C-alpha cells in the first residue's frame, strides 16, 4: 500500500473523529446512554467527592486547630514548627504516589481506597492524642502515606469512565463537592471547640478525634459502594458496560488496560508533557494549599476575632466552588482548556495582590475569594487538560501519579514560603504564589503552540499522535 494512501487513511480517521461527536453512541438509544451515564455519575461522583472532601479537611485542618489553641499547647509558635508539621505530610505523599497507582489496578479500587481512607482516618484520630510537637509530625507522616494514593486513584478511575470532553465537568463536580464541604469545615471545627475540657481533652484535640472517627466510618462506606473500573464494574448490566467501553474506545482507543512494561513506564515518566502538566499542577495546588492552611490565620491577622475568623474562612470556598464548576462547564462546552486555565491564573494573581497589599481588611478578605476562585478551578482543569491529551491506561497511571505528586511539592512550597516571621501579610509567600501563576501561563502558551503544530501535522497525514490514528490534542 502506498504512503499516499496511508496518509489518506490517517486523514479520514481524523475527520471521522472531528465530525462525529458521539460515534459509538449512534448504536444505542440516546435515552439509554444518558440513563447509564447518570447512573455512573450518581454512583461515583457524590461518594468520591465526599471522600476527597474528608481528605482535604484532614490534611489542612492543622491551621484551624492551631487557631483553636494547639499552638499554645504544643508550642508551635517556636521557630518554624508549624510550617514543618504542615510540610512533613507532603514528603511521603509525594514518594508513594507512583507505587500506589501501579498497584491500584492489581488490588482493585474498592480495597485500595478502603485501605487508604481507614489508614489516614486512624492517623487523624491519633493527632488528637499527641502530647508534643514531635509526635504530631509522626502522625502527619502516616497521614501522608495513606493519602498518597488516594487522589491519583480517584482521578484515574473517573477518567476511565468518560469521554475526553465529558471529563472536566465530572472532575469539577466531585472537586466542587469537596471544596464546599471543606470550606465549611472551619465552622464545624469552631463548633467542636466548645467541647474544650470534655473528658479532659482540649477543644483542638476534639477536632482531630471526631473527624478521624468520621473518616474511618466513611472507609467502611467506601468498601460497600465505591465502583471499580468500567471493565470490572458490577453495578452495570452487560449491555451498559459494553456501551461505556465502546464510547471510550471510539474516543481514545484505551478502554481496555494495556500491560505495563518498563519501556512504557520510562516513556511516560520522561515525557516532557508529563512534567509540563506536573509543574502546572504544582502551580495550581500551591495557592490552593496556601488558602487551606493559612486562610483562617490570615483572616485572624486582619483583626477579626477567633470566632469570626472561623466563620469567614468558609465563604471563599463557596465562591471557589461556583467558579470551579462554571469554568469546567465552559471548558467542556467549548472543548478548550488552556485559555480558561489562563483566565483563572489572572483571577488568582489579582486576588493575591489584593490580599497582600490592600490596606482595608474587607478588600484583603475579598482577595482571598479571588485567589481561591482562580486556584481551585485550575486543579481539576489541569487534570482534565492532561487526561484529554493521552491514550493508553499504562501511561495514564504513571503520568497521573507524577502530576499529582508534584501537587504535593506545591503543598511543601506553600507551607514553607508562608513563614511565621512574615505574619500577618505573608508578602514573600504572596509573591512566590504569583510566580507560580506566571510560570503556569508560560507553560500554557508553550503547550498550546506545540499541540497546535502537531495537530496540523496530524491533519496533513504527516504524524500519528499518541500512537493512535485519528487522535488530536485538545488545546
Question: At which residue positions do the language-model features occur?
Answer:
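Intracellular terminal tails of multi-pass secondary transporters
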Residues: 1-54, 59-60, 68, 223-258, ...
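Extracytoplasmic gate region of multi-pass secondary transporters
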Residues: 63-64, 263-329, 379, 383-384, ...
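Extracellular/periplasmic helix-loop-helix junction of adjacent transmembrane segments
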Residues: 63-95
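Conserved MFS/SLC helix-loop-helix module at the cytosolic interface between two early adjacent transmembrane helices
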Residues: 94-134
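Helix-to-loop junctions at the C-terminal end of transmembrane segments
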Residues: 95-108, 322-336
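Structural signature of the two symmetry-related core transmembrane helices
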Residues: 111-125, 339-354
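Intracellular juxtamembrane helix-capping segments at the cytosolic ends
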Residues: 149-162, 377-392
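Glycine-rich segments within core transmembrane alpha-helices of 12-TM secondary carriers
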Residues: 168-201, 208-215, 400-414
Amino acid at each position: 500500500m502506498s504512503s499516499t494512501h496511508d496518509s489518506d487513511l490517517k486523514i479520514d480517521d481524523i475527520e471521522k473523529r472531528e465530525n462525529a461527536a458521539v460515534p459509538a453512541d449512534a448504536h444505542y438509544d440516546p435515552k439509554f446512554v444518558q440513563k447509564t451515564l447518570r447512573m455512573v455519575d450518581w454512583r461515583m461522583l457524590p461518594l468520591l467527592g465526599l471522600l476527597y472532601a474528608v481528605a482535604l479537611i484532614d490534611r489542612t485542618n492543622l491551621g484551624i486547630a492551631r487557631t483553636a489553641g494547639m499552638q499554645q499547647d504544643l508550642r508551635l509558635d517556636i521557630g518554624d514548627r508549624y510550617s514543618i508539621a504542615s510540610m512533613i505530610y507532603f514528603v511521603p505523599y509525594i514518594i508513594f504516589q507512583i507505587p500506589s497507582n501501579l498497584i491500584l489496578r492489581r488490588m482493585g479500587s474498592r480495597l485500595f481506597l478502603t485501605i487508604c481512607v481507614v489508614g489516614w482516618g486512624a492517623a487523624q484520630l491519633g493527632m488528637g492524642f499527641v502530647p508534643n510537637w514531635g509526635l504530631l509530625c509522626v502522625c502527619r507522616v502516616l497521614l501522608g502515606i495513606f493519602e498518597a494514593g488516594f487522589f491519583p486513584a480517584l482521578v484515574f478511575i473517573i477518567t476511565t469512565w468518560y469521554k475526553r470532553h465529558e471529563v472536566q465537568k465530572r472532575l469539577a463536580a466531585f472537586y466542587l463537592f469537596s471544596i464546599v464541604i471543606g470550606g465549611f469545615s472551619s465552622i464545624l471545627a469552631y463548633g467542636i471547640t466548645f467541647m474544650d475540657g470534655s473528658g479532659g481533652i482540649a477543644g483542638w484535640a476534639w477536632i482531630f478525634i471526631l473527624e478521624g472517627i468520621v473518616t474511618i466510618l466513611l472507609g467502611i462506606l467506601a468498601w460497600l459502594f465505591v465502583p471499580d473500573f468500567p471493565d470490572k464494574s458490577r453495578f452495570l448490566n452487560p449491555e451498559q458496560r459494553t456501551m461505556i467501553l465502546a464510547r471510550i474506545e471510539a474516543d481514545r482507543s484505551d478502554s481496555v488496560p494495556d500491560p505495563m512494561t518498563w519501556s512504557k513506564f520510562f516513556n511516560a515518566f520522561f515525557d516532557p508533557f508529563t512534567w509540563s502538566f506536573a509543574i502546572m499542577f504544582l502551580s495550581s495546588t500551591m495557592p490552593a494549599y496556601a488558602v487551606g492552611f493559612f486562610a483562617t490565620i490570615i483572616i485572624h491577622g486582619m483583626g477579626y476575632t477567633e470566632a469570626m475568623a472561623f466563620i469567614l474562612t468558609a465563604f471563599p470556598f463557596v465562591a471557589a466552588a461556583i467558579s470551579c464548576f462554571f469554568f469546567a462547564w465552559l471548558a467542556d462546552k467549548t472543548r478548550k482548556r488552556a485559555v480558561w486555565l489562563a483566565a483563572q491564573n489572572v483571577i488568582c494573581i489579582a486576588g493575591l495582590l489584593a490580599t497582600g497589599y490592600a490596606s482595608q481588611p474587607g478588600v484583603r478578605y475579598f482577595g482571598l475569594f479571588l485567589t481561591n476562585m482562580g486556584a481551585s478551578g485550575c486543579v481539576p482543569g489541569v487534570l482534565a487538560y492532561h487526561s484529554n491529551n493521552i491514550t493508553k491506561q499504562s501511561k495514564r497511571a504513571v503520568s497521573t501519579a507524577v502530576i499529582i505528586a508534584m501537587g504535593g511539592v506545591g503543598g511543601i512550597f506553600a507551607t514553607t514560603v508562608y513563614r511565621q516571621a512574615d505574619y500577618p501579610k505573608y508578602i514573600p509567600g504572596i509573591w512566590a504564589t504569583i510566580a507560580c501563576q506566571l510560570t503556569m501561563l508560560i507553560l500554557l502558551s508553550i503547550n498550546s503552540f506545540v499541540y497546535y503544530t502537531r495537530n496540523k501535522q496530524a491533519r496533513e497525514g504527516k504524524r500519528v499522535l499518541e500512537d493512535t490514528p485519528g487522535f488530536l490534542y485538545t488545546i
